[in-house]
Amino acid sequence: MERKEIKDSAYLFLGSIGPAFENITLGIGDKLALKAIAGAYRVSEEEVKKRYSRTGDLGDVAFELNQGEEKSLAIDEVFGSLKEIKEASGKGSQEEKTGLLSSILQRASPKEGKYIVRIVLGKLRLGFGDQFLLEAFSIAFTGDKKYVVKIKESYSVCTDIGELAESLAEQGPKALGHFSIKLGRPVRSMLAQRVKTFEELEERIPGKKAAEEKYDGERVQIHKNGEEIKAFSRRLEDITAQYPDVIEAVRKGILAKKIVLDGEIIAYVEGGKANDSTGEFYSFQRLMKRRRKYEVQKYTEICPVAVFFFDILYLEGNSLLKKPYPERRAILEEHVKESEILHLARRIVTDNLEEIEDFFNEALEKRLEGIIIKSMGRNSAYEAGKRSWFWLKWKEEYASGMRETFDLAIIGKYYGRGKRKGSFGALLCAILNGEEQRFETFTKVGTGFTEADAKEIDSLLSEHIISEVPKNVLIKSRMLPDIFVEPSLVIEVLGSEITESPSHTAGQGEGDTGLALRFPRFLRIRHDKGPYDITTLTEVRNLKEGKSI
């Protein structure tokens, strides 16, 4: 396989033709795909619709209808055709896209056609994500699994999986450790560990430490390269267009020519001041009004935002990832000119737990999530893509006893009754078994939803309904839902206790008993997380054993 084919293949394995941060869409929905399939295999659209109603998958329909001889398309041929589909625009573009898709389906084998249709629709369903692919890279390009950790570390900085695959194919293990920050290519965010008790904050980070406010907003990474400014989400999505006010504020308030900043965008109460220590902020759900393609200016006025920067990763050609936190914070303070929109995360530096507790209570009074404790040590580097012990989070739920929060993937719906008739009555949710790259059932959530929540969840799940259990999901027969859903939507759930259960498959051992969450309650949709960003089996086991996760 040639170098370019390796790069293109890496993208195609994840159902795209480019890195995640390019927000690539091919502009073909079910309706156009249905027409293209009908044209390619010379059947009526009604016939395609009938088969689609039965299978629930247009890729499977293409496979069924392709009765031609076995052929084999070259990777560059597939990739080139998909790029043509993406680039078709303007008047007559829908017909052009349909024709291009029909053409490549006619040249494809049944299996190739099945996956081409799924890629075009953004529903590849191979049952694995980028982390699984990185493990495959280790074996394919180095001949040894021992490089997996280093490959994942490199991917946290070089988030272009095609570029990473190409470099590994060319240089093998020598490519590792040489990736650096590149403007316009987001770095994976460093995340905070959770502790079980307030006293553990001192055990984990003894002596002097920083306590920062933890904001209930959207994590944002700002890249400024001269006049070009981009904003990226925690999921590496380009969200520049949703926040024109933030981009303009950065243009005016950040004087450095080349800089990468890490922070949180939050919505604040109209009439208040975001930088006022007594000011109040709206929840993350309010902020989601800004995540829209249309009427951006209208919602800029309806939902004003502020950005609180807490780290700096790059400055004028130099990566700052390996510098200790105190140095990075000092550099950050030098380069952020505060304004109505731009702010530095409020913090204190102390070795006194009572002062930290007071600071935590102040944060709760402002409707903030809690606080982040940060190490002031010499080795407190920015660990991209890691949940690091250099940062610890302490939230209201942790302070209230046994209650814990979990980010879970929805994998099924049960029909609702009474007031919930026409919607779901409960959701079957799963954690991620990282070792097996499999979703395992953990709880059934039926409380905490408002009517608006239920309506939004139904809408978001409508495109992900499937006819059978996904290959990467493990469910016991007694828990089979009325409707199967491919893992796509993540919700945050509050629970009180982790118990052993014969009904669930999370961590299921030889005794056929898994782990389950008792008294679950829905808190919110996590638009900022994907199915492979959820709570893991390792984290659940640690909590069950009384350890921190």
From Swiss-Prot:
Annotated keywords: ATP-binding, Cell cycle, Cell division, DNA damage, DNA recombination, DNA repair, DNA replication, Ligase, Magnesium, Metal-binding, Nucleotide-binding
Domain of life: Archaea
Pfam families to which the protein is assigned, alphabetical: DNA_ligase_A_C, DNA_ligase_A_M, DNA_ligase_A_N
Catalytic reactions on record: ATP + (deoxyribonucleotide)n-3'-hydroxyl + 5'-phospho-(deoxyribonucleotide)m = (deoxyribonucleotide)n+m + AMP + diphosphate
CDD domains cross-referenced by the UniProt entry: Adenylation_DNA_ligase_Arch_LigB (cd07901)
GO molecular function: ATP binding; DNA binding; DNA ligase (ATP) activity; metal ion binding
UniProt keyword annotation of Transport present: no
InterPro entries: ATP-dep_DNA_ligase, DNA_ligae_ATP-dep_bac/arc, DNA_ligase_ATP-dep, DNA_ligase_ATP-dep_C, DNA_ligase_ATP-dep_cent, DNA_ligase_ATP-dep_CS, DNA_ligase_ATP-dep_N, DNA_ligase_N_sf
Record-annotated disulphide pairs: none
Active site: 214
PROSITE patterns listed in its UniProt record: DNA_LIGASE_A1, DNA_LIGASE_A3
Binding site for ATP: 212, 219, 234, 264, 310, 387, 393
Cofactor or coenzyme needed: Mg(2+)
GO biological process, one term: DNA biosynthetic process
EC numbers, comma separated: 6.5.1.1
Keyword hit for Nucleotide-binding: yes
Function: DNA ligase that seals nicks in double-stranded DNA during DNA replication, DNA recombination and DNA repair.
Membership in a protein family: Belongs to the ATP-dependent DNA ligase family.
Protein name in the entry: DNA ligase 1
Lineage: Archaea, Methanobacteriati, Methanobacteriota, Stenosarchaea group, Methanomicrobia
